[in-house]
């Protein structure tokens, strides 16, 4: 491999000759050989491109940067956003907790690429300086948290929310389709009074609806950007009005409602907005866990389980048991939920580590957040496509379970009293007989009264 010599304030560094990065990026590559290379999320790189372009425009408008340099920086940022420079960002998550080296990776690549676009060669002194121009009016301490918010907001709004809404809509449709299917309810995993399958599915739709509401309610905080706070939140070395102006440009370029942070000190020292939004993602993950568990239990069998619903048969389920089919989409969903719960633990702890004016767990928070947001989106689409949309009632099994339930006796409470109703249920269970048989044998009701009072379809109420 051929190398060229790049310099920073610590001296000379050998850099691969054909790469646009420079000394500080190469030092980080050599110093942090931890985990897979280039593990810094691409969403963070893209977010940096948006903010570097916005900073160039804001600085130029405020007289701190020439329009020539602005246009060169913007041109390279557009190339990054078009995925033309993907191989130029080799750094890992496991680096400085402020993300300084990734910030410099962007600065160096933009400066060197701009020089080449001007007809220069790598290794020559560039017309664009990585610190003085690309990083003008910025610090890693305000750029990385800004990139975190841009990446997180975009992912949640453009990817996660639409996917959850899709699955929520399917459950709402199923709830309406199953509104007349009366089945036995279960509490404590034991038989309970009847409800409709539609009512059961309405709970799933409502869970996701509330989860979406919680998620959307976190977005105003996430939309606040730290950029303009520079090193500790004071805005040192920025032109007047820069913080507001740069946020306006980011909003313009992303077409998302970003604004400057109300308090830059909070925006640098803490990442409560990330914790808050991920908390809503965790809420949704726990809802999905519950839903997936219910569905795989309701579909259990096919002959020796509950078996009240039929789910799509997507692939063989066993390498040894012929004909076995498993609830694989439910299993995938529960594993995703477990991962999100683990990510939330990491994010919550990392968020507590804001010592004085700076939190230094930024990259791991960003990576875990983005993984959760993407996984939840992917699993909602997968579950909707390969499971939820194909769920159908198993009518014979539902009727069999309903007729066999002792908890239908609850309908007699208001006619013969709780204790007499309990006596009927216990006697029927002990003798292996029906509720009707024992109610008549015990002389507590007539056959006509039993048929009039114990009607499952009248026990489901009017709530939907």
Swiss-Prot record:
Query: What Gene3D superfamilies does the annotation carry?
Result: Fumarase/aspartase (C-terminal domain), Fumarase/aspartase (Central domain), Fumarase/aspartase (N-terminal domain)
- Site positions (Important for catalytic activity): 331
Pathway noted in the entry = Carbohydrate metabolism; tricarboxylic acid cycle; (S)-malate from fumarate: step 1/1
**Can you quote a single GO CC term?**
cytoplasm
Top enzyme class of this protein?
Answer: lyase
The reaction(s) annotated as catalysed by this protein in its Swiss-Prot or TrEMBL entry are: (S)-malate = fumarate + H2O
Principal location class: cytoplasm
User: What subcellular compartments does it reside in?
Assistant: Cytoplasm
- CDD domains in the cross-refs: Fumarase_classII
Q: Keyword Cell wall biogenesis/degradation on this protein?
A: no
Locate the residues binding substrate: 98-100, 129-132, 139-141, 187, 319, 324-326
Domain of life, per lineage: Bacteria
**InterPro entries recorded:** Fum_hydII, Fumarase/histidase_N, Fumarase_C_C, Fumarate_lyase_CS, Fumarate_lyase_fam, Fumarate_lyase_N, L-Aspartase-like
Describe the subunit structure. Answer: Homotetramer.
Q: Which PANTHER family match?
A: ASPARTATEAMMONIA/ARGININOSUCCINATE/ADENYLOSUCCINATE LYASE, FUMARATE HYDRATASE, MITOCHONDRIAL
The protein's name in its UniProt record: Fumarate hydratase class II
* Native species: Haemophilus ducreyi (strain 35000HP / ATCC 700724)
